[in-house]
Amino acid sequence: MSLSPVIFSIGPVSIYWYSLAYVLGIVFAYWYLHKLDNQKIFTKNFYDSLLTAVIIGIILGGRLGYVLIYDPVLYISNPIEILKTWEGGMSFHGGAIGVLLAVIISCRRHNIPIFYTLDLISCGVPIGLLLGRIGNFINGELFGRVTTMPWGMVFPESGDNLLRHPSQLYEAFFEGALLFVVVNSLFYLNKMRLYYGATTGVAVMLYGVARFMVEFFREPDYQIGYLWFNLTMGQLLSIPMILLGMLIYLGALNFRFNTKSIQ
């Protein structure tokens, strides 16, 4: 399977599918945040501040997370490569930390409840993940392990001619589409939004579970390989996410979110 990562080029400037995926994900999350904030707690100044901070958090956190966790040697020897975000190489875990810091800073500055904001953001984030994984698929990166299944694909970046799981599409479905449906269904149908931080906890926990399971079909990063107990780096990073999500959810059950006194 070989798809061009470039949508089109105008002179020396190229527009990449991967970059477009990030832009569309952020635009959707921004629009969806407006839609979910039916109490109009957020002001225009807060939206603008949050959007700017989140974009910076995603780019810096995602890129630095990938550089420090997955391939520090390469980027130390070729630091200019750190700037080439359009070629892929973004860490969800690093990006999540960047977004968290962005939300905390923006909420503190505008006196907006942090977990209320995180809950609403958690409802829209899976669509960004879905689009990002499709971008990975188009780039032909983060491919799966060798398989004999009829839907196996050959990825030129693997350096061989073997059929592999299209694990990027598995992640797009489980970490993106399915997570979006489940989290939003719980948010609306089970009144989870009445419990401060519950949606955030569930989203973090379910993402960790989905990522841990899909990693069994994804080829480990060549520079890292398998680690403790034959697990991948992605799986090891997902374990604390699952535990953290559970703690946030259980903690939220003890502090019911009163929508009439949200401040």
From Swiss-Prot:
Molecular function via GO: phosphatidylglycerol-prolipoprotein diacylglyceryl transferase activity
EC number(s) per entry: 2.5.1.145
Pathway(s) the chain acts in: Protein modification; lipoprotein biosynthesis (diacylglyceryl transfer)
Parts of the chain that traverse the membrane: 6-26, 50-70, 85-105, 112-132, 169-189, 197-217, 233-253
Keyword Nucleotide-binding set for record: no
Any one annotated GO CC term: plasma membrane
Alphabetical list of Pfam families matching this protein: LGT (PF01790)
The entry's keywords: Cell membrane, Membrane, Transferase, Transmembrane, Transmembrane helix
Major place of residence: membrane
Classification via InterPro entries: Lgt
Membrane-related topology note: Multi-pass membrane protein
A Gene Ontology biological process term: lipoprotein biosynthetic process
Binding site for a 1,2-diacyl-sn-glycero-3-phospho-(1'-sn-glycerol): 133
Sequence similarity: Belongs to the Lgt family.
Function: Catalyzes the transfer of the diacylglyceryl group from phosphatidylglycerol to the sulfhydryl group of the N-terminal cysteine of a prolipoprotein, the first step in the formation of mature lipoproteins.
HAMAP family from the UniProt entry: Lgt
NCBIfam families in the cross-refs: lgt (TIGR00544)
Stated name of the protein: Phosphatidylglycerol--prolipoprotein diacylglyceryl transferase
Gene from which the chain derives: lgt
